[in-house]
């Protein structure tokens, strides 16, 4: 069904970064709702994949000590729609991601994948852009973490 060269599974951010450095051509996937469809269509035949689905530290929604709402990039659309923090403070984001596909897609699709995949149907990107979202990026080790405004990384 899927013509892939290899599938690597990361269970920590550090492991994901190490795998990416070791396999620079590999496509990073979380839920895989877009990438796996493209593979099934033959558009990414023979691809290497790095799954970050098992990194629990990248899931969830909370308010940090500075009052910022933090949404892990592996947080599913269905989780975002139901989350009390989102409902109270950014209900429009919950409404936007509730428009994504059907329930199956909302259960597996992630906000990180939706904003990073570069597809025109990125339902969450315009809302995050309007709310001046900031993304956290990391390099080879945690000391290389930095933040960047989403709008500086995307063409919306």
Regions found by a protein language model. Give the residues of each.
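C-terminal structural segment of proteins
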Residues: 1-148
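Positively charged, low-complexity/disordered segments
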Residues: 146-156
């Amino acid at each position: 069904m899927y013509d892939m060269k290899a599938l690597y599974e990361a269970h920590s951010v550090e492991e994901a970064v190490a795998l990416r450095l070791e396999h620079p051509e590999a496509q990073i996937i979380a839920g895989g709702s877009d990438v796996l469809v493209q593979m099934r269509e033959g558009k990414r035949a023979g691809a290497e994949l790095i799954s970050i689905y098992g990194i629990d530290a990248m899931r969830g929604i909370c308010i940090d000590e500075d009052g910022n709402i933090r949404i892990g990039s592996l947080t599913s659309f269905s989780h975002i729609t139901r989350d009390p923090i989102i409902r109270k403070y950014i209900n429009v984001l919950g409404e936007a991601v509730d428009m994504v596909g059907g329930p199956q897609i909302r259960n597996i699709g992630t906000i990180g994948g939706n904003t990073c995949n570069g597809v025109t149907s990125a339902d969450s990107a315009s809302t995050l852009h309007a709310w001046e979202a900031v993304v956290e990026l990391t390099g080879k080790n945690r000391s290389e973490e930095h933040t960047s405004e989403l709008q500086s990384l995307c063409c919306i």
